[in-house]
């Protein structure tokens, strides 16, 4: 093996994108493929983990509403522990790790322990969601700037968000703001006094994507009738989401949840073909690969939890 080809100890802080596996960057894919250990978030598409080697260790460190979560301090400690005992560690996060992904805390820990690292950007939810609406976050003559903000603060504090961008005809993208939506919409009404268009995109780019549109004065009522656990939602406020097409709001289509059974390398190609047309996919290679115990256990749990509408056997 040449010096350039040798794999050195390193931690990659990788953005997995918004959910559709076809939106994973090539760099992120290469990091996953060479990882010895993957620490992954709840929002990561399960199929993306299956791009890894069968002998890679998977560790779930996700923060999930309504359930116990892994504290950030524990995640930081795991990064150090695994980096000191393995060659390549991937910290796999939904979206872009540098946008509300607490990447600075993990970087500070790695620097403190002199562990080499690299941040690998991913497609963030706001831009992915707008692509699904057939719109841009900015629009000439309508919105010339964009603000990303979060509705979820440290220690669950309910801090005010900066509405300056709306006062200046910009676009506001609110991450993790569904629980605080009534309060946030009320703040816009009181401080700005304009009934802006609003769109909320749940599970953007995934097969179970769901879009709800309205205005600042109506959107809370419209999402109140939805099931409690719709999945992650990004809220877009501003004139860029005015007059959305009916096809965007109700796309129709017969999307399936597909289980592909077979050896991983071969199954990945088939799974990608289904994912590219909007279907949810998972690989079951437990009988074909010498899997790391964490992989076998995780795949078995996913299969038990998911309802598949189609199974494809490659044997």
Features from the language model and the residues they span:
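Glycine-rich, flexible N-terminal cofactor/catalytic loop recognition
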Residues: 2-64, 164, 273-278, 286, ...
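Short, acidic/turn-prone active-site loops that include or flank metal/cofactor-
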Residues: 18-19, 43-45, 61-68, 123-125, ...
């Amino acid at each position: 093996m040449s010096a350039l080809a040798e794999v050195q100890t390193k931690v990659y802080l990788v953005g997995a994108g918004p959910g559709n596996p076809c939106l994973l960057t090539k760099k992120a894919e290469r990091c996953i493929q060479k990882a010895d250990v993957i620490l992954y978030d709840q929002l990561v598409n399960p199929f993306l983990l299956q791009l890894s080697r069968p002998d890679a260790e998977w560790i779930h460190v996700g923060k999930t509403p309504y359930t116990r979560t892994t504290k950030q301090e524990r995640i930081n400690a795991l990064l150090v522990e695994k980096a000191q005992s393995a060659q390549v560690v991937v910290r796999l996060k939904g979206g872009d790790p540098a946008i509300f992904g607490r990447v600075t805390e993990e970087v500070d820990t790695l620097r403190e322990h002199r562990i080499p690292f690299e941040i690998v950007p991913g497609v963030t939810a706001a831009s992915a969601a707008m692509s699904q609406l057939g719109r841009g976050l900015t629009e000439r003559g309508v919105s010339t700037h964009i603000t990303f903000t979060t509705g979820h603060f440290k220690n669950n504090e309910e801090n005010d968000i900066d509405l300056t961008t709306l006062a200046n005809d910009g676009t506001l993208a609110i991450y993790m703001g569904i629980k605080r939506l009534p309060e946030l919409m009320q703040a816009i009404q009181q401080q700005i006094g304009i009934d802006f268009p609003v769109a909320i995109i749940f599970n953007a780019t995934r097969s179970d994507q769901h879009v709800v549109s309205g205005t600042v004065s109506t959107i809370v009522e419209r999402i109140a009738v939805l099931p409690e656990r719709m999945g992650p939602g990004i809220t877009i406020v501003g004139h860029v989401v005015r007059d959305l097409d009916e096809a965007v709001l109700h796309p129709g289509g017969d999307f399936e949840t597909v289980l592909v059974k077979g050896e991983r390398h071969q199954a990945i190609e088939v799974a990608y073909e289904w994912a590219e047309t909007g279907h949810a996919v998972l690989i079951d290679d437990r009988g074909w690969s010498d899997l790391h115990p964490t992989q076998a256990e995780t795949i078995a749990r996913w299969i038990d939890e998911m309802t598949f509408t189609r199974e494809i056997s490659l044997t």
